[in-house]
Amino acid sequence: MKKVTYHRGWLTAILSIIPFFIFSLIFQFIGIGVSSALGQAGIIEFNFDTYLEAEDAMRDYLAADTIIQYFDLIGIFLLLWILMKFVDKEPFINLGFSIKGKVNDIILGMTLGLLLMAVGYSILIFLGEIKFVSFNYDLKSIVLLFLLFIAVSVVEETYVRGYVLKNLLKSFNPVVSLIISSAIFSLLHFFNPNVNYIALTELFIAGILLGVSYVYTKNLWFPIALHLSWNFF
């Protein structure tokens, strides 16, 4: 029995990758359809052809991209509910959504992300690598960006840390589990615009950082908040 349990964790984690992409693709296309309908109605700015051609779609169609990401979130949550119910046979909340310590974890994660970005920004300013020119304050864009990054952070942390890392820990020690889950986290961004090997390496390191707290707490609130803060700031 122990041998079966040992193999089942890593196998479940790896086999979940294909349905993850399938569900993500299907629900993102549903989101594109909804955004297209809203664009034709003049409610938001959206054109399917230019969206696919845009080098940075989020910049040009922020509202549409936010809608698409929330449909992605719905799809991935549906997939994870199915997997937890019929494969893992555990409650969905066991992914790491315990409410204990939720507020403190969120505050700590948001604060740490802000501090890390502030330190990095200050170092680059000091070294002359970047130069502050101006600050473009657009409340609508800021709110949409925040909502967008909430969806991105929740999807990626719930799947990579809450499901993949959780199952890998059933088979391997924390170090091996962190390495494998971080590699998967990095590769999930392989098709992102302008991604390169340096970016993938940075994502791998970020995956380690985001996964460490989950290993010890089995709670997703801190890595979600840190991921959100990292992206937003």
Model-based region annotation:
Residues 117-120, 173-190, 204:
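Small-polar-interrupted transmembrane alpha-helices in polytopic inner-membrane proteins
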Residues 155-180, 212-219:
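Membrane-interface helix/loop boundary segments of multi-pass membrane proteins
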Residues 9, 91, 101-104, 138-139, ...:
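Membrane-helix interface segments
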Residues 1-91:
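N-terminal, membrane-interfacial amphipathic/helix-forming hydrophobic leader that caps
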Residues 34-67, 89-158, 165-170:
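Juxtamembrane helix-loop-helix connectors linking adjacent transmembrane helices
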Residues 70-78, 139-147, 155, 201-208:
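Membrane-embedded alpha-helical segments of multi-pass membrane proteins
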Residues 10-18, 67-70, 106-111, 142-143, ...:
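Hydrophobic alpha-helical transmembrane segments
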Residues 27-29, 199-233:
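Functionally important transmembrane alpha-helices
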